[in-house]
Amino acid sequence: MYQIEEKDWKLYREKLPEWQEVYMERLIREYAELLKSDKAASEKFWALDKRIRADRQSLGVRVIEEGRSKLQNILTGLIIEHVVSVDDLQDFSEELRESTSQWIQTYCKNLAE
């Protein structure tokens, strides 16, 4: 298993709040579109309520700076949930990027089975 380097850990702690803000801005734009629809006010209200409840479970909203040992899982989850892309990891070490790619491949393979 890949050992997380201090440089990667510090970079993650720096980038996480930025990633979360960008993700939440995207969610807010999607909520605004939902509210602009021609549906009845009650339908929009309950659809928005349901959506926000679901989005609260997303790593882009709820992840905090957990321990270094969970970094690999968190990055993989953030990519799978489309909070960030593989390109967002370009400043991280090559080892971490490769390890994350392997985790994603394993996840996708398991989904296909």
Label each PLM-derived region with a short phrase.
Residues 1-113:
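Acidic, Ser/Pro/Thr-rich low-complexity regulatory regions
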